[in-house]
Amino acid sequence: MYSTTVLATGTKDTSLVNRIFGLDMQLVVDVAIMGLAIFVLFLILSYLLFNPARELLQKRQDRIKEEMDSSAKDKKEATQLKTNYEAKIKEASKEVDEILSEGRKKALKRENDIVDEAKVEASRIVDRANKEIELNKSKMKDEVKQEMIAVASVMAGKIIAGNIDETKQKQLIDEALNEMGDETWQN
């Protein structure tokens, strides 16, 4: 605004120099007008720039808060899903254990059934063998009886034919018994 004029003679006007450095009423008014202009400019810029910037920052802050809330919610859901899956895994493991236990029980029962069936079959075989032995014994007894009858009839024929005395008769019976063996009579 103010400038110093240099005369063609090369001398400066000292009144102007004093005025630049001196505080007078004009300078105070200019500073007040400039301060008022800066204040008005600040209000206008605040309305035009700072409010949108604040709104932008507030929106960003709200969006970040929503994202944090959403991530906390997602984390909570993930934790809940994890606990649900762990519970399902435990339940499945328990079911597997139950199935294996049931399978073991069935296998053990089947094993016991097979052993019982084998015992029954073995008992039947032993009974059948005992019956066959008894049958063979009775056949042998019948054969021995038939043999004794045949020997007795031969002896009777000899006694009648030769009129054998009593000592001779005892001797013939003893011989017949020796031929058949003592075991036959003991069974």
Swiss-Prot record:
F(1)F(0) ATP synthase produces ATP from ADP in the presence of a proton or sodium gradient. F-type ATPases consist of two structural domains, F(1) containing the extramembraneous catalytic core and F(0) containing the membrane proton channel, linked together by a central stalk and a peripheral stalk. During catalysis, ATP synthesis in the catalytic domain of F(1) is coupled via a rotary mechanism of the central stalk subunits to proton translocation. F-type ATPases have 2 components, F(1) - the catalytic core - and F(0) - the membrane proton channel. F(1) has five subunits: alpha(3), beta(3), gamma(1), delta(1), epsilon(1). F(0) has three main subunits: a(1), b(2) and c(10-14). The alpha and beta chains form an alternating ring which encloses part of the gamma chain. F(1) is attached to F(0) by a central stalk formed by the gamma and epsilon chains, while a peripheral stalk is formed by the delta and b chains. It is a single-pass membrane protein. The chain crosses the membrane at residues 31-51. The keyword Zinc-finger does not apply. Keywords: ATP synthesis, Cell membrane, CF(0), Hydrogen ion transport, Ion transport, Membrane, Transmembrane, Transmembrane helix, Transport. It is found in: Cell membrane. GO terms for cellular component: plasma membrane; proton-transporting ATP synthase complex. InterPro entries: ATP_synth_B-like_membr_sf, ATP_synth_b/b'su_bac/chlpt, ATP_synth_F0_bsu_bac, ATP_synthase_B_chain. It comes from Lachnoclostridium phytofermentans (strain ATCC 700394 / DSM 18823 / ISDg). Its main location: membrane. GO terms for molecular function: proton-transporting ATP synthase activity, rotational mechanism; proton-transporting ATPase activity, rotational mechanism. This is ATP synthase subunit b. It comes from the Bacteria. Belongs to the ATPase B chain family. The gene is atpF.
